[in-house]
Structures are given as structure tokens and as C-alpha cells.
Amino acid sequence: MSMYMPGATAVGITFDGGVVFASEKRIAFGNFLVSKTTKKTFPITPKVGATCAGLVADMQILSLQIAALAKIRKMELKRDVPPNTVAKMMSNMMYERRYFPLLTQVIVGGVVDKPIMYTLDPLGSVLPDEYAAVGTGAEMALGVLDPQFKPNMTKDEAIDLAKRAVRAASLRDSASGDGVDVLVITKDGTEEFTEEIK
């Protein structure tokens, strides 16, 4: 972790009928703990959401701009904007800023036809996956996700796995911690809640 690139841990998991995002709540710059209550999960549309690691301010701006573009696109298409379209819009915006990049890693996903998820780096490359982890705690989170993820999990199994992955990273990564924010997206809409890390 560099002095000006804060650490974080964020994960995303697809399950049978939706996607779940989880992130911890800490922001630290170098040795300084800036915040213990930062939200790093973002609903973009009622059917698409995202989570991030890196500069949260950059992700806040990106999510607001993409949410506005998605509303315009929905009015043009007269139907829900699918996750791959949202991921591509994010990718385009991040690539346009490649010389002054948005310093954030993003997991974006949702469900319109079927659950799908993508990981984006600060330059906008789009990588599809069934589950993902980003940030300084990604290695620890993937140590939980890799052996325990299975396709077509139930909603409760996916939420539990996401929380355990973030918890494992928070216990070993000094830049992660102070609670878990969870965002669940299904065809019925979004659900958000916060839990302490125990």
C-alpha cells in the first residue's frame, strides 16, 4: 500500500438469482486511520450495483455519473440497463481518464436476465467472473472464496461467504476493517445492511 493509495477489501459473488457485494468500512492513508464508517458499496440502478477498493472519492464520482448515464440509457431503451452495459460505460469513462486515472478497482454486477459480474481496473479493462475480490486484502479474501465458492449458491450461502471473505481479510490486512457493508441485488431489487466484524 502506498502513502497515497488507500487499502481496502471488497468482494463480489454471483448466486442463483442475484449478486452480493461486500466491503469493509475503513479508510487509511499510510499509518493514519481516516474513517471507520466509509461506504464502499454502491447501487447503480435497481438491478446493478458495484463495490470498490482504492480512492473512494473517485468511485463516488464514477458511480454518480454512471447512475445518471444508466437512467438516460433506460429512458432511451425503455427497459432495464443490463450489467454488461453498465460495466462498459464504466470502462469507457475510466479509459478516457487513463492519463489522469480514477484510482479505484471496481467490481460491478447485477441481474437482468441472469446474474453476472465484472472486475475493472483503474484503466477500465473489463474481466467477467463468477466471484472476485479487489484491494489490499484481496489475497486473503480469495483464500476464502476460491475453495468455498460453488455455482448456483443460495442467497444466504453467498451472503455468508462474502462476509467471511471480508472478515478474513480484515483480520490480516491493517488497511481493512471496522465492519462489513453488504449489498444484495436480485430481480426483486436491492437490499443493504451493515454488520460488525467479529
UniProtKB/Swiss-Prot annotation:
Q: What is its EC number?
A: 3.4.25.1
Any one Pfam family here would be Proteasome
Q: Which GO terms describe its biological process?
A: proteasome-mediated ubiquitin-dependent protein catabolic process
User: Keywords assigned by UniProt?
Assistant: Autocatalytic cleavage, Cytoplasm, Hydrolase, Protease, Proteasome, Threonine protease, Zymogen
Compartments, record wording: Cytoplasm
Propeptide residues per the UniProt entry: 1-8
Q: How is its activity regulated?
A: The formation of the proteasomal ATPase PAN-20S proteasome complex, via the docking of the C-termini of PAN into the intersubunit pockets in the alpha-rings, triggers opening of the gate for substrate entry. Interconversion between the open-gate and close-gate conformations leads to a dynamic regulation of the 20S proteasome proteolysis activity.
Q: Which InterPro entries match?
A: Ntn_hydrolases_N (IPR029055), Pept_T1A_Psome_bsu_arc (IPR019983), Pept_T1A_subB (IPR000243), Proteasome_bsu_CS (IPR016050), Proteasome_sua/b (IPR001353), Proteasome_suB-type (IPR023333)
- Name any GO cellular component annotation: cytosol
Class of this enzyme? hydrolase
The protein's predominant localisation is cytoplasm
Q: Does the keyword Aminoacyl-tRNA synthetase apply?
A: no
Citing just one GO molecular function, the answer is: threonine-type endopeptidase activity
> Residues in the active site?
9
Q: Which reaction does it catalyse?
A: Cleavage of peptide bonds with very broad specificity
Under the heading PROSITE patterns, the entry gives: PROTEASOME_BETA_1 (PS00854), PROTEASOME_BETA_2 (PS51476)
Q: What does this protein do?
A: Component of the proteasome core, a large protease complex with broad specificity involved in protein degradation.
| Complexes and interactors | The 20S proteasome core is composed of 14 alpha and 14 beta subunits that assemble into four stacked heptameric rings, resulting in a barrel-shaped structure. The two inner rings, each composed of seven catalytic beta subunits, are sandwiched by two outer rings, each composed of seven alpha subunits. The catalytic chamber with the active sites is on the inside of the barrel. Has a gated structure, the ends of the cylinder being occluded by the N-termini of the alpha-subunits. Is capped at one or both ends by the proteasome regulatory ATPase, PAN.
Family from the record: Belongs to the peptidase T1B family.
Q: What is this protein called?
A: Proteasome subunit beta 1
The scientific name of the source species is: Nitrosopumilus maritimus (strain SCM1)
